């Protein structure tokens, strides 16, 4: 009986199924995305955005488990997470300049130096934090507090040690603007040509897909 000597390599199939890339039946999905998670939310509005992986899609348009509010997140989950189909073109019509709500002086009670805002989709650049006692001056981001998202897409305020928030159970007044997906209408989906910028919006952006990506739309979801 012979024995194997030396180093040998054997490979096993991974349990992760990579996306199957297709050139026919390209999915083009219109809907709403939590673009507040992006550095520049306006960069992902009424613009065809292509993604080949789950991670790429999340980095380009954001992700939320609230599929009722953010419909493109469901497309990400189904296309990449369940069926493994790529690429997908996403067109977000939720515009933070239009579809938004303002909140003034929401009282946020900290617990252990942390507190969560009551609305998701918060636009970070709009956040103003003050102490609840009297007319104290505003607190400074990254000096007195930091902002972060929890697993459900809500914004968490955390006091920074050495900052002006000295009590771990302090109450803060927070004013901010958040996305309002409910303000998106069928007219935003249908779109057209902007009379001022002459740019395509909504479904009119279908005609931009082939010139941008050299791929022909096959399935349209809205």
Residue spans for each PLM region:
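Surface-exposed assembly/interface segments
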Residues: 1-222
């Amino acid at each position: 009986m012979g024995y194997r000597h030396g180093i040998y390599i054997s490979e096993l199939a991974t349990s992760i199924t990579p996306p199957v890339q297709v050139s026919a039946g390209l999915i083009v999905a219109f809907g709403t995305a939590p673009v507040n998670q992006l550095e520049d939310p306006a960069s992902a509005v009424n613009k065809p955005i292509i993604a080949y992986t789950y991670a790429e899609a999340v980095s380009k348009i954001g992700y939320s488990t609230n599929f009722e509010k953010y419909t493109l997140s469901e497309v990400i989950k189904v296309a990449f997470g369940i069926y493994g189909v790529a690429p997908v073109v996403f067109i977000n019509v939720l515009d933070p300049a239009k579809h938004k709500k303002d909140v003034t002086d929401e009282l946020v009670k900290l617990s252990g130096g942390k507190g969560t805002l009551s609305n998701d989709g918060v636009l970070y650049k709009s956040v103003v934090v003050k102490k609840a006692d009297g007319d104290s001056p505003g607190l400074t981001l990254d000096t007195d507090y930091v902002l972060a998202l929890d697993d459900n897409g809500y914004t968490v305020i955390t006091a920074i040690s050495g900052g002006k928030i000295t009590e771990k159970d302090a109450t803060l007044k927070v004013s901010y603007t958040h996305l309002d997906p409910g303000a998106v209408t069928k007219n935003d989906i249908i779109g057209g040509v902007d009379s001022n910028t002459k740019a395509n919006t909504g479904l009119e952006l279908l005609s931009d897909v082939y010139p941008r990506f050299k791929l022909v739309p096959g399935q349209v979801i809205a």
